[in-house]
């Protein structure tokens, strides 16, 4: 982000008019800050002193989760920085984050009015929108209802317990065949390249009721758009924090808007096709479920806010995003960790062999009997912390936290990485150790420890895709562990240094996989 903004600042200084406007804005911000009245009994937020115009951007380097963690060690779990001309409160520490998002959840339930957010789903995004509480709550309730219908375990059947299980099991089988086929031809494979396509197929099946071949150009186009979106968002948009830059040519922002337009048009086309073929007695997927809601003209029972047909596109767009990049990143990290810790990989396979066997495919109903696998997934979430921050929150009224005054409309960052690596919360936090989530005898999952891991956010803005995420990662991973053994490619050592972006991904690598004796007991 810093590297992007410095050349822009140079171009701004070349124009006297723009310099004057920036100066006026700066003077206004300083005067506003200096005249912010602190209620009696409360304290002013601590934090580093900002520089003119750019604030503390030079101190927030290319790995902001690390630099902000270092600042929290100096200033505490609640402190303020200035990014450009926007004050930002940074929250760290498990207790502080829980206090803000759960106990004082209403105060911190807003979304910051960042400029770029207006272009995500044409400003109708459930996750990014600054809509009033009644509006986003009504749409969130609708989205959660659709997800529960298709993505959660509501009792087993001879076939599949839910649509998610059906889609993942079929796609998992195909992924195993793909990896073994690639191994036969090339002798190694790129885990992210194949996993991301499989995960995209699952969410397409859930949302759109269609499955693509892995070389389908429409599917690959979706995958590429998601990758572009992550790159652009991860690089940051200076106009979010220096308002005057909105009026200057911005190649990155133009690319960001183009990606959103392309994906919105794709989803709009799918939704229109669903309207044409909609059958109330045959709800095929999540899009049909949302249309069914709008056809029945159901109202939010609290706010009486009707969800219009146009909002369906935004909700489907959000659900696709919630069920795609996060899950593919988690699964790709999981395979890399299996290679990095081969003894853990063998323990996981042994657990599956004993509890599920080598004849049938693992199911969602097996999850309760696979505590080590669940612990492994939790430790991947914690150790990699591939979602280092939540989407920025915003205070909806003047409030206080830990004795510090926080004004209304303040942008709030939640440092999930710090919580997941806090030495006060975890023993040897830098060590990868799934056993930290197991009981002393290793037979049960310690759910209280698992609840400390922060990956999907918490409180009123908790990720709506969490149910999909946890179950999908579990099912895919169980199938892969049961069928395949993963190894490092000789001469290609793993580099697990994360690359910062919307989600932190591992460096692309080449791995090896070999079939286990599937279909017969070892």
From Swiss-Prot:
Superkingdom of this protein's organism: Eukaryota
Cofactor field: heme
Compartments it resides in: Endoplasmic reticulum membrane; Microsome membrane
Database matches in Pfam families: p450
GO terms, molecular function: catalytic activity; heme binding; iron ion binding; steroid 17-alpha-monooxygenase activity
Cleaved signal peptide residues: none
Induction (free text): By 3-methylcholanthrene (3MC).
Entry GO terms, CC: basal plasma membrane; cytoplasm; endoplasmic reticulum membrane; heterochromatin; microvillus membrane; nuclear membrane; perinuclear region of cytoplasm; rough endoplasmic reticulum
Alphabetical UniProt keywords: Endoplasmic reticulum, Heme, Iron, Membrane, Metal-binding, Microsome, Monooxygenase, Oxidoreductase
Expressing tissues: Liver.
EC number: 1.14.14.1
Positions contributing to heme binding: 463
Stated role: Cytochromes P450 are a group of heme-thiolate monooxygenases. They oxidize a variety of structurally unrelated compounds, including steroids, fatty acids, and xenobiotics.
Record-given protein name: Cytochrome P450 1A3
Species whose genome carries this gene: Oncorhynchus mykiss (Rainbow trout)
Gene that this polypeptide is encoded by: cyp1a3
